[in-house]
Amino acid sequence: MIIGVLVDEEYHVQDTIISNKMTECIKHIHGSINLIKTKYPDVVIDGSILILRPCAQNGKGIKNYIRLDYVDEKGKNRVRMWNLRQC
């Protein structure tokens, strides 16, 4: 089951994320992601869009986190990060 698309900082597709644990992580994310859906219509997962990309925890060092940028139901930009070891 493909549950995400991993892209680099410039949104070039690097890999697909296939992980049941990642699915469990993403189940905690609620809200509208219409802004991302409009900008990146090719990345669609279960009717929702997930832009997943590698990053470091504070912008420096090894990119051992997955970052998800999304828009919540109030239209606010949100970021969720997971350590790759967790997923």
Give a label for each model feature:
Residues 4, 18-20, 38, 53:
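Serine/threonine-rich, low-complexity intrinsically disordered segments
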Residues 22-26, 30-33, 37:
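Residue-level detector of alpha-helical secondary structure
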Residues 10-26, 80:
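A short, exposed loop/beta-hairpin motif centered on an aromatic-Gly-Thr core
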Residues 1-13:
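Short aromatic-glycine-(Arg/Gly/Cys) micro-motifs in beta-strand/loop hairpins
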Residues 34-87:
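Short, mixed-charge low-complexity intrinsically disordered segments
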